[in-house]
A protein has these predicted regions:
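Extreme N-terminal starter segment of soluble prokaryotic enzymes
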Residues: 1-5
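Hydrophobic side chains within alpha-helical segments
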Residues: 10, 21, 37, 149-151
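Hydrophobic positions in the central parallel beta-sheet of the AAA+
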Residues: 6, 36, 140-142
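Short polar catalytic/cofactor-binding loops
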Residues: 7-13
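Conserved strand-to-helix beginnings and helix N-cap segments that scaffold or border functional pockets
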Residues: 16-19, 153
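Catalytic metal-binding/acid-base residues of hydrolase active sites
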Residues: 9, 42, 82-83, 146-148
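Cys-nucleophile CN-hydrolase/nitrilase-fold catalytic domain and related Cys-dependent amidase chemistry
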Residues: 15-16, 23-100, 107
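Active-site catalytic loop in hydrolytic enzyme cores
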Residues: 55, 68, 86-158
Length: 158
């Protein structure tokens, strides 16, 4: 399995440029890899004061475009994380797992918000951690500060 970890310069307060650049890099990397992993909040960076207008939904064009890349290139994508507004109206720091057929097979909302960045002022904490299958592999998602809490990984392993 060939895995690409996408690293890009995220411009503060310039979602349009971030999305265009991220999708371009994703399309290029997906041609040569089996799995593509994007970074946390790659569409917005930590311009958290702009989340009300910058938050995605599950039906957003960004996820649809990543799904199209996955389907066209037969490359699974862990879509980093994006600020996502859910049906409850709250914004979560959400990671989508997209299989090589372009189907979203898991959405994970960051559970442990990082106090130093005051994430709790902008994001709601998730509680939906579960293992999932991505193109035949058993996987689990976590985001950044979640790594400080081993019980989350223990739960995913069981």
């Amino acid at each position: 399995m060939k895995i690409a970890l996408l690293q890009l310069e995220v411009l503060e307060k310039n979602k349009e440029a971030n999305v265009a650049h991220g999708l371009q890099l994703a399309a290029e990397a997906a041609k040569k890899h089996d799995l593509l992993v994007l970074p946390e909040v790659w569409t917005t960076g930590y311009s958290l004061g702009h989340l009300e207008q910058d938050a995605e939904t599950q039906a957003s064009p960004v996820l649809a475009q990543l799904a199209e890349i996955a389907r066209n290139e037969q490359c699974a994508i862990l879509a980093g994380s994006v600020p996502m507004r859910h049906a409850d109206g709250k914004i979560y720091n959400t990671s989508a797992a997209i299989n090589k057929n372009g189907e979203i097979v898991n959405l994970y909302d960051k559970v442990h918000l990082f106090g130093l960045f005051h994430e709790e002022d902008f994001f709601a904490p998730g509680n939906n951690f579960q293992a999932f299958t991505l193109d035949g592999l058993c996987c689990g998602s976590t985001i950044c500060y979640d790594l400080r809490f081993p019980e989350l990984f223990r739960h995913l392993a069981l």
